[in-house]
Amino acid sequence: DGAGATILEKVNENGGIINHKSSTFTSSDEIDFLSVEKSYKIENNNQFIKMKGRKVYEFALRNVPLAMKSCLDDSSFNINQVKKIFIHQANKKMDHAILNRFYKLYNSIPSEGVMPMLIEFLGNSSVATVPTLYDQVLRKKLKNHSLSKGDIVLFASVGAGMNVNAITYQV
């Protein structure tokens, strides 16, 4: 696992957080996606956190693109102005599916390189994936990815609980 932090301060210039959407889903269906249970190994009585991975995957594909669209639509920007999309990197296949479903909501397809990825190098580093990825792109440490002042980006995540978040941000 990893950790990420962001320092926010009020400034008298354009940029920063333009809009955000956050939702927590607490119905009995979503709460059941995670549980604490005994190991599958008979000789081990320890308790482990278990996740219904397919259910989480389906939940993410259903809810994250909608949160991203709602967040972007309520900002003063459109899909063609988004330079990069940073999605929590739990699963590369899932992130690509989220990205494609998001663009499909606009009857569009994602441009090449709009979604930088580090999962093949860092794995799923928990809440650190988005801040780490953003930092790597800002510092031009990720080949073929960069940002400039004024660029519009989207941040998105899905997490245990179940929580969905999206932020429209201007660099």
Model-derived segments and their meaning:
Residues 10, 21, 38-41, 50-55, ...:
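Context-gated lysine
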Residues 1, 29-32, 73-74, 95, ...:
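Acidic-enriched, low-complexity/disordered segments with a strong bias for Aspartate over Glutamate
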Residues 40-47, 72-76, 107-111:
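Short amphipathic alpha-helical segments, especially helix-boundary/capping motifs
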Residues 3, 59-75, 133-141:
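Short, well-ordered amphipathic alpha-helical segments that serve as non-catalytic structural scaffolds
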Residues 1-58, 66, 158, 171:
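Condensing-enzyme catalytic core mediating Claisen C-C bond formation in acyl metabolism
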